[in-house]
Amino acid sequence: MDRVVPAVLAGGAAGAAGRWAIGEFGWSSATNLLVVNTIGCFVLGIVIAALPEREHPIRLALGVGVCGGLTTFSGLAVELAVRLDAGDVGEAVAMGMLSLGLGLVAFLGGRAVPA
């Protein structure tokens, strides 16, 4: 446990730095969000498949730390709320469905990699 906390913190910092770096490509906030969440789901699929022990320190560092720092569910909520507030219900629904669909496909694809 003593080694896990610093590893998760370092992983979280790396993930957050990755999210910031992806944001520097100049894409829209919606595209950035879709990219980071899809990458995070793919990586998490690999991590969970490769390290099935739930409390494995590397799984925690990569899954909770890196993937947790990279992805953002709250960012998705903000993007959807902005669209709903603007009256763009169809766009909000499409974005939500696309995010969930791509996330699931990416996770399943990542989970298949170690096999």
Residue ranges of model-derived segments:
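Membrane-interface helix-loop junctions in multi-pass transporters/channels
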Residues: 1-115
